[in-house]
Amino acid sequence: MGHFMSIRVLTGITTSGTPHLGNYVGAIRPAIRAAGAPGTESFYFLADLHSLIKVQDPERTQRSTLEIAATWLACGLDPEKVWLYRQSDVPEITELMWLLTCVAGKGILNRAHAYKAVVDKNRSEGGDDDAGITAGLFMYPVLMAADILLFNAHQVPVGRDQIQHIEMARDFAQRFNHIYGGEYFVLPEAAIDEQVATLPGLDGRKMSKSYGNTMPLFCTREELKKYVFSIVTDSRAPGEPKEAVGSAVFQLYQAFAGVEECSMFAQALAEGLGWGEAKVRLFERIDAEVAPLRERYEDFMRRPADIEAMLCDSAGRLRERDAIPLLARLREAVGLRSLSLCMASAVPVPQEKVALPVLKQYREQDGRFYFKLIDGQGAVLVQSRGFASPRDAGQWIALFKQAVSAEALVSPMLEPVADPVVVLAALRRLREAG
């Protein structure tokens, strides 16, 4: 997975509900096909904190998170090539949310579509504007902005109904950058896929849980067959020509078959293929693609501990690489700093000029690359462990120089630090020296 030099693409995954074929064709399959594209670093997170706005059943929350993680892994998302993590495993997200809350305008949040929709519904029913509205629903756009800005995502694939949230994230980022005088955040862009496929449901309308017309992605082969055979069709009998265009059976077939197969299927319908036989062909075509995914899904569901370990490992590495260093910079920017350092700078004491600390990068006989922080008298304050390349060491040095808390000095890549206060003071001098 790349770092800094790639375009960062971040995708949030809802962790409530059971995935259906419409989710698979319209969101899961295209997202996985796009994952790991050259020059792209892909981030996928399970939005379990967001789910708490609507779901307050602990068992359901836990189960849904497992099912959704297993679904994406079964469908081919490779955690060796992309970042897959659970939102609640990255506490810096909620800390950043608070920092953004302190610069977000309430007027902007008042205009959020989800919030306004509930207010309008309450008014139409003659109720209080805020009846049934939690602070979580109202603050949802700020949490979404924190999801995006913590990893400085360049692009966020969303539907048109979500563009407003990306615009809000840009607004919060610009406000923070302006108030605190730095380029702390990249301004994200909404990536709109105009070709998003929508599948018809069992009744011919768009497949949607709200219509109750969905086909679960991982139902059994027998259940899938029953769903397919319950698709509503017209009354034309076998032998009568049938229009492929507008037919739910044909539209579903198109989502799982190639151009040539679809052409042959349309021709067969025009020549009088019966709906019963057409549904048999549709069922076999869908099952041919879904069956191996179903098998992988069932395997993952039998190994929840493996999924847990993978999610925790991914979140831990992302926190160390991106989240903790950025929050250290933001804490420094807003003034959440060590008071001991504040006292040192607030009460200047005349003293002899002392040489600046220095960071030295070098190569050892083992072929690995190291760095150390040395104070003005030549004493080693911090010693790194070995890196595979000078580029890796250099990137880590850049992050290390921004450390403003003792927690940031605790890392597998650093030898234990004896005196964090002295080290933080030395790093502060380096930053002030420019």
Curated annotation (Swiss-Prot):
Q: Which GO terms describe its cellular component?
A: cytosol
Q: What does this protein do?
A: Catalyzes the attachment of tryptophan to tRNA(Trp).
Q: Provide the E.C. number(s) assigned to this enzyme.
A: 6.1.1.2
Where is it mostly found? Answer: cytoplasm
Q: What is this protein called?
A: Tryptophan--tRNA ligase
Catalysed reactions listed for this entry:
tRNA(Trp) + L-tryptophan + ATP = L-tryptophyl-tRNA(Trp) + AMP + diphosphate + H(+)
Q: Which domain of life is it from?
A: Bacteria
Record-linked CDD domains = TrpRS_core
Subunit-level organization: Homodimer.
Keyword annotations? Aminoacyl-tRNA synthetase, ATP-binding, Cytoplasm, Ligase, Nucleotide-binding, Protein biosynthesis
Location of the protein in the cell? Cytoplasm
Residues forming the motif 'HIGH' region are 15-23
Species of the source: Xylella fastidiosa (strain 9a5c)
| GO MF term set | ATP binding; tryptophan-tRNA ligase activity
Q: Would you identify the family this protein belongs to, as annotated?
A: Belongs to the class-I aminoacyl-tRNA synthetase family.
Q: Name one Pfam family in it.
A: tRNA-synt_1b
Per the record, the GO terms for biological process are: tryptophanyl-tRNA aminoacylation
- Report residues binding ATP: T14, T15, S16, G22, N23, G159, R160, D161, L199, K206, M207, S208, K209, S210
Top-level enzyme category = ligase
Q: Where does L-tryptophan bind?
A: D147
- Is-annotated flag, keyword Protein biosynthesis? yes
Q: Tell me the lineage of the source organism.
A: Bacteria, Pseudomonadati, Pseudomonadota, Gammaproteobacteria, Lysobacterales
The sequence motif named 'KMSKS' region is recorded at: 206-210
